């Protein structure tokens, strides 16, 4: 039986691959795929405007190829984890 952290990491990977490759490269997220992932998989997703998602995409896309690769996605998750941790502190 997998440990909870193993399961959580597996879920993060599975969610990336659930949305990646619907358009173009199966190992990256397009802007449309990233938007869909955020809106369907994160509570904050329904609150973000298109302009905010576009800015997020620009910030995440470090290599400026107009797609978010897995490393860029993990950077995003790390930033979210820091925000969630701060919220728990109160």
Curated annotation (Swiss-Prot):
The gene is S100A6. The N-terminus is blocked. One of its GO terms (biological process) is positive regulation of fibroblast proliferation. It is a peripheral membrane protein. The modification Phosphoserine is found at residue 46. Homodimer; head to tail assembly of 2 subunits. Interacts with CACYBP in a calcium-dependent manner. Interacts with ANXA2 and ANXA11 (via N-terminus). Interacts with SUGT1. Interacts with TP53; has higher affinity for TP53 that is phosphorylated on its N-terminal domain, and lower affinity for TP53 that is phosphorylated on its C-terminal domain. Interacts with tropomyosin. Interacts with FKBP4. Interacts with PPP5C (via TPR repeats); the interaction is calcium-dependent and modulates PPP5C activity. Interacts with TPPP; this interaction inhibits TPPP dimerization. It comes from the Eukaryota. The keyword Nucleus applies. It comes from Homo sapiens (Human). InterPro entries: EF-hand-dom_pair, EF_Hand_1_Ca_BS, EF_hand_dom, S-100A6, S100/CaBP7/8-like_CS, S100_Ca-bd_sub. The modification N6-succinyllysine is found at residue 47. This protein co-purified with the prolactin receptor. Its main location: nucleus. GO terms for cellular component: collagen-containing extracellular matrix; cytoplasm; cytoplasmic side of plasma membrane; cytosol; extracellular exosome; extracellular region; nuclear envelope; nucleus. This is Protein S100-A6. The keyword Lipid biosynthesis does not apply. It is found in: Nucleus envelope; Cytoplasm; Cell membrane. Pfam families: S_100. Ca(2+) 2 binds at residues 61, 63, 65, 67, 72. PROSITE patterns: EF_HAND_1 (PS00018), EF_HAND_2 (PS50222), S100_CABP (PS00303). Ca(2+) 1 binds at residues 28, 33. Gene3D superfamilies: EF-hand.
């Amino acid at each position: 039986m997998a440990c909870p952290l193993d399961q959580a990491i597996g879920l993060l990977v599975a969610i990336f691959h659930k949305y990646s490759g619907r358009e173009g490269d199966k190992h990256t997220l397009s802007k449309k795929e990233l938007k869909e992932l955020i809106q369907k998989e994160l509570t904050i997703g329904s609150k973000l405007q298109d302009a905010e998602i576009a800015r997020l995409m620009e910030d995440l896309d470090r290599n400026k190829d107009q797609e978010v690769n897995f490393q860029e996605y993990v950077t995003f998750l790390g930033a979210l984890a820091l925000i969630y941790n701060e919220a728990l502190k109160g």
